[in-house]
């Protein structure tokens, strides 16, 4: 494949050309180096003409910055990437309101709520999750459960479709979760990968279904109480009561 540089972004030109030929869109994740030297874990949204219509930089950076010899493998994302200063934004694309998130972002409810407050109807998430979690291996058997839990909850509580696309299989001895999913605004999984190799899953995503939840149980304008949630943005870590 030929590669090219578009500003500070490296793209695989043939993928863009093929998207335009087929009339389909896609997301592409890459390591971004900005002209002023910042490094981000970045995602672009490409429409059916092959044009970039959205860009997102990862907010929640997991892992560690220094080598930890006791680990069977290193998770050095915090060494190589900075936290995004941009937050979560949506774009109008594919006839709806689309938001993006990357990997660890999917575990945080704030991700979906910030997008939900902008009317998101389709959240696109790419993730690469090892089956082994070194800080607490007792969570290993729960990886699939937790993966579904966070994306289904985010979909339901914000009345949006969620498409989670996973990297599966074994690379350099590390097994990844896989389990790509398409989740409806009801929180129901309507399509899921059941193998760890390359596989295509699909579903018809009726964006009008989002209104069933956005205009009823999760009508934010009627039921949300921002004044009761101030601690969420005013405080970062846990602060137990004294005494």
PLM regions: where:
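Single conserved hydrophobic/aromatic residue that forms the stacking wall/gate
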Residues: 1-7, 11-12
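Active-site beta-strand/loop signature of hydrolases that rely on acidic residues for catalysis
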Residues: 8, 19, 26-27, 105, ...
């Amino acid at each position: 494949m030929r590669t090219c540089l578009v500003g500070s972004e490296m793209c695989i030109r043939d993928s863009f050309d093929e998207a335009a030929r087929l009339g389909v869109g896609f997301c592409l994740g890459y390591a971004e180096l900005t002209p002023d030297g910042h490094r981000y874990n970045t995602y672009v949204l490409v429409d059916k003409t092959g044009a970039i219509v959205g860009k997102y930089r990862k907010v929640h950076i997991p892992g560690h910055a220094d080598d930890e010899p006791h680990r069977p493998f290193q998770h050095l994302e915090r060494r190589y990437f900075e936290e995004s200063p941009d937050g979560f934004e949506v774009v109008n694309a594919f006839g709806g309101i689309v938001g993006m998130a990357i990997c660890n972002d999917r575990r945080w409810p704030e991700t979906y709520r910030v997008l939900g407050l902008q009317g998101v109807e389709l959240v696109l998430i790419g993730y690469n999750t090892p089956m082994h979690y070194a800080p607490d291996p007792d969570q290993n058997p729960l990886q699939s459960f937790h993966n579904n839990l966070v994306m289904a909850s985010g979909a339901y509580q914000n009345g949006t479709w969620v498409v989670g696309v996973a990297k599966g299989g074994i690379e350099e001895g590390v097994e990844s979760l896989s389990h790509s999913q398409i989740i409806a605004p009801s929180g129901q999984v309507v399509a899921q990968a059941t193998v760890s190799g390359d596989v295509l899953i699909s579903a018809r995503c009726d964006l009008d279904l989002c209104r069933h939840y956005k205009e009823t149980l999760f009508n934010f304008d009627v039921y949300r109480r921002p004044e009761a949630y101030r601690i969420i943005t005013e405080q970062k870590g846990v602060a137990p009561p004294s005494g």
